[in-house]
Amino acid sequence: MSESHSQDGAPQALDMNNELRSRREKLGQLRQQGIAFPNDFRRDAVSDQLHARYGEKSNEELEALNIEVSIAGRMMTRRIMGKASFATLQDVGGKIQLYVARDDLPEGQYNEQFKKWDLGDILGTRGKLFKTRTGELSVHCSEIRLLTKAMRPLPDKFHGLADQETRYRQRYLDLIANDESRQTFKVRSRIMAEIRRFMMDNDFMEVETPMMQTIPGGAAARPFITHHNALGIDMYLRIAPELYLKRLVVGGFERVFEINRNFRNEGLSPRHNPEFTMMELYMAYADYRDLIVLVETLFRTLTQRVLGSSVVHNGDQTFDFGKPFTQMTMKEAICHYRPETRPEALDDMASATAIAESLGIKVDKSWGLGRVQTEVFEETAESHLIQPTFITAYPAEVSPLARRNDDNPFFTDRFEFFIGGREIGNGFSELNDAEDQAARFAEQAQAKDAGDDEAMFYDEDYVTALEHGLPPTAGLGIGIDRLMMLLTNSHTIRDVILFPALRPQK
């Protein structure tokens, strides 16, 4: 008798109502016996460790070693064959097969307990390792216990939960059912650990800055608003930690970084979630060119340590992070991907506006030349930046926190880097001229008054901090979720966030 699910997804035995009723009755019996949810079983191994250590050994070698293990996990399949059964146990490391025989257990346990347990129940078992005739590493159970009664059945297709909406709304089912999802989030955890290791190795100090702020700053985005009852003031979930981190550099912490959540009250898309993870770092006595070297080194290190190779495959694209990234200015990128564009046409407001409008861009009368150039770049070039590429020379108009370029103050010493047609990060030499910063904040405030919801607020305290002296500094932000999409071959941000934002169910 087999208890996996049929191909059409319907349980083989009872309909759902009867299934739930049956499981509740079984739990009621366990409660009466006083053993409903025991908590005294301890395991000494997990499945992947056992496969790694003993998977290549023969049955004769395992018999000679006489290895007894205690493992625990969720029963995913069971095949009852009279006086003996095979079951699959799934734990954090993967799966391992159990062999359960009536005569190896206390009298009555096999028929009265084990055979009545359900798929999805969490079991603890102890027994010796052996190999079946087909060579599968298994545990010959001498003790087996029910640790948690599952009140609901496994997803219809335990080999892979097919419904995308269910995967995101009930991530726990996705993690039970899909090996690929479990692996994605394991890799995410390793990447996060390796980023922190890299930063520590480069003498950065990890810090935490406020998630609720009285003035949101550090990015052009619409914030979430909340209210602090005790203080009687509105506050904002942060859109970026930048201005607080630079205050720390003013205070003497010369290399700082933070990995944490940002919140932006914007739309949902395969690349956007309103709550997302960013890393920002700031290093004194450095400029944007030092950040370019740091980014290339970080990606090379991450891919080697986590994936074992600097070559990454994502869909039909391949990236080699062992090589330097391509570099080009924003104007060069526009002219490269829209060859009919003359460079000098981008330097004139009228001709640049005509180019933008020919691309279907609705130019707002409040925009300056820098904003128009940036919109044209995003429309013509951004999606074509497949191989790792730094785009430099962003206009000051769209870079209110970046240092102006010494040779041409229309531009800033800033870059964004793109991989697979996606912006992954943004870095620049920091503006440390308090008067220039105050003037740019004033421009942003005017834009906000004119209806630009994403323009920055004027942060007077930050200007005061700059007046105390910010050393020459470079700062970088990397979108961790987009990085995870890249390194785990995922095609939507929902696949790399455990609990993504979703529209309410109707």
Curated annotation (Swiss-Prot):
Report the leader peptide range: none
Its EC number is: 6.1.1.6
Which enzyme class, named as a word?
ligase
**Compartment list:** Cytoplasm
Q: Name one GO biological process term.
A: lysyl-tRNA aminoacylation
Principal localisation: cytoplasm
- Catalytic function, reaction form: tRNA(Lys) + L-lysine + ATP = L-lysyl-tRNA(Lys) + AMP + diphosphate
Q: What's in the GO CC field?
A: cytosol
* Cofactor-binding details, from the entry: Binds 3 Mg(2+) ions per subunit.
Transmembrane segments annotated in the record for this chain: none
Instruction: List UniProt keywords, sorted A-Z.
Output: Aminoacyl-tRNA synthetase, ATP-binding, Cytoplasm, Ligase, Magnesium, Metal-binding, Nucleotide-binding, Protein biosynthesis
Binding residues for Mg(2+) 2: 423
Write down the SUPFAM superfamilies for this protein, in alphabetical order.
Class II aaRS and biotin synthetases, Nucleic acid-binding proteins
Molecular function via GO = ATP binding; lysine-tRNA ligase activity; magnesium ion binding; tRNA binding
Which residues hold Mg(2+) 1? 416, 423
**Could you give the subunit structure recorded for this chain?**
Homodimer.
Q: Which family does it belong to?
A: Belongs to the class-II aminoacyl-tRNA synthetase family.
Q: What is this protein called?
A: Lysine--tRNA ligase
